[in-house]
Each structure stands twice: as C-alpha cells, then as structure tokens.
Amino acid sequence: MTTLELNNICKKVLAQGCMELGLIEKEEDIGKYYMHGVSHHLGIDVHDVTVEGVKLMPGSVITDEPGLYIDEWEIGIRIEDDLLITQDGCQVLSAGIIKEPEEIEAFMAQ
C-alpha cells in the first residue's frame, strides 16, 4: 500500500461518516472538513516529509492521524497513533496512550 492509497481510504471513511451526519452530500465534499493527509513518516525528524505514492515498507514508522474540523460545530477532532509497518501489517506503537473522551477528560481533571 502507498501513502496515497492510505489517504484515499481515510477520505472515503471520513466522507461516509460525514454523509451519515448530514454534513456533506457526496464524497468529493469531504475537503470542507478534512484538509490534510492522514499520515507522515517519523524517524529522521518529528514530522518527516512524506512523498505521496511512496510504498509503505516493513520497518517504516508513520503516523495515523485523521482529522476532522467542523467549523459550524466549533470542533476539531484529531487523535494520533504511531505505527511501525511490519511484514504482516502494523504494530501500534502508541497503543498505551489514552484516547477515549472519558479517559482524556479524567486525565485533564487531575
């Protein structure tokens, strides 16, 4: 899979959700709420430059950070994971980090 293919899959999933919520009428309209890519490489720097279309190879480390920004609801949602690409898929390096709203709110209240 390439980084471009990964981003296209993400756009389809986010568009479907936005259509179900009545935010957009067709997939092509997702750019109103999703204005960046889903991923970039990590390793050399904090935010490595990723060239679209580069095949994801075992040993690569990338982010998984789809984000939706819904101005009319005054909300932005973007939760990141870091992934190690393996021969058979990926290993979620950030699996132990809290992500559920209740967990985040409890942590912030400390």
Regions found by a protein language model. Give the residues of each.
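Active-site neighborhoods and metal-handling regions in enzymes and metal-associated proteins
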Residues: 1-110
